[in-house]
C-alpha cells in the first residue's frame, strides 16, 4: 500500500484510537483518584526501537509524547508473547522520571514475529520513602524517594510475578491502592495489544510496519515546516524557580535556542548545577529526552494544531544537557520533584521562541502548579491517603484571546478532582475551591486566573504535601505590553489570629481543626491592558474575575453603577498612556521581584557563576553556588559599589583560599 498523506491520516486515526482505548481502560479500572480523575498517566504504541508512534489526544498527561523507550527495551534480554516488563528507576534508562511513575511495556507478537510494543506509565500516589507521596524538595538522594525497580518482567508469558507485588506492598503506604492501579495498568496493556492486533488484521503485517515509519516521517515533516517559519537566529531566555532547596536560593534555567532553517538546537548550558534537593531532572543527557522537549512540543502545537503527536516531531531538534546540571542530574541525586523543573522548561522554551516570534505565541502560563495530597486517619484509625489534585493557574493571554482560567498546558492538562470525591476519599472538609479574582496578568488579552483550594483536616498526625510549590516570588511574565500574573500564597489557618504563611513549604504537619489554603498564581497578560475593550473589562468585573478597583488601576476603566463611564475611562487611559514606562527587557514584563533580582544577578554575572561551577566536580557545585550568592549579598549589605562580573571571580578566589581542598578538586574536574 502506498502511504500518501490521506492513507497516513487514516492509519493514524486507527492507531490513535487504539491508544485512546488503552487510556479509557486505565481510567475506568484504576483505583487512585490521581489516575482515574486527575489522569496522571500516559500510554502509547511504540516501535520495536522504542519510539512512540501514536498517543491519545484526549486523555492522560501530555508530557510524554516523545518519550524514548529504547534504553529500557534493550535491558530485557528475551521477549516472549504474554510478557510485560516494568521499571520506576530514573537511573535505569531515564524512561521512568521519578519513582512514583511506574512504566510498563508489553511486546506485541503476530504470527510469531515481534511487531511493536504497547506501553505507558502511571503515577502512584505513594511508593514509600521518607515522606507520604514519596516527593519533597527536602529529599537529597534517590534512596529517600521510595522503592525502585530496575527494568524487570512483572508478567512472564502471561503469569504475574506476585513476588514483585509483595515487595512493593511491603514498602508503600497504601498497598491495596498500588496493587489495584498496577492491575489496571496491566489491563491497559492487554487492551492495547488487542487493538493493535485488530489493526494488523485490517492492514496486514507489512503495511502496519510501513505505517509506523510513515507516521513518524509525517510528524517530522510537519515539525520541520513549523520550525522553518521561525527566523534563523540565536535566542536566549532564562527562567527561575523561587528556591533550589528548602529556604534556598533562586534556581535558574537557561536556554540558548538556535534556529537554522528546518532544525533547532535547545542548549541548556548556563542552567544551575545539580541540586541538593529533588528538583533535578534525570534526562541521562539524551539529545531528545521528553522532559527537555515539553515546551518544544507545546510551541509546535500552538503554531500548528493538526500535528501528529509522536516521536517524529523530535527528529529536527536536539538538546544540549550538561552533565551534573539540574537538567541532567547524575546518581544519586534526588529527582522526585523534577516536574517543577520540567514546568519551567515549558515556559522557558516559550520565552526563547517568543524572542523570535512574540506576536504568534502566548504570554507565560501560570507555572506554579502544586499537587496536593493528604495522609490522615479515619474514625477507625485506618491510614488513608489521597491526592486532592493540582492547584495552579491558567494559561497565558494569547494573540487572539484570554488565557484559560485555572488550568492549561502548564499542568500537562491534568484534570481537577471533584470536591465530593476528595471528601469521600479522605476525612476532610472543603471550604472553597474557586478561581482567584485579580490573579490573571492584565493585558489586551487577560492571563488565566489562579485556583484557590481551602480545606480543613480533623485527625491528629495528618500530613499535607504540596509538591512543586513555587511562584511565591517570581511571577509569570506578560508580553508585548501585557503584565505579569499574581504570585501564589500558601497559608495555615488563614482567618485565624495565628495565621501562618507557609511560603514554598511542601510538607505540613497538621493538628486537628487546621485549615490549609493554597492560592495558585496567575498567568501573564498579552498586549497593552489599556487596549482591552471596556466591555470586556466590565464583563470580567461582573463575573468576579477582576475587581472594580483593578479595572481602574490596571485597565483604566472607570465604572459607575455597574456601567462603564466612557468619558472618564478615555480621560484616565490618556493619562495612563502618558505615564507608561518602557520595559527593561521588551517585550517581556517579569514583575518586580525578577526585575530586582536581575539588577543584582545580571546575565553576565550569572554566566560567570555557571562557568565557575561547570569547572568544579559535581559534589562541590551546589555548595559553591550558595557561597557565591551569600558573598554577593554581603557586598550589597555593606553598601559597597559592585560593578560587572569580575566580582563573581573575586568572590570565588576568596572561596579558594577559604577551602584549600577546592583547588585540587577544580584542577581534576
Predicted regions, residues:
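Glycine/proline-enriched, intrinsically flexible loops and inter-domain linkers
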Residues: 1-81, 86-110, 114-668
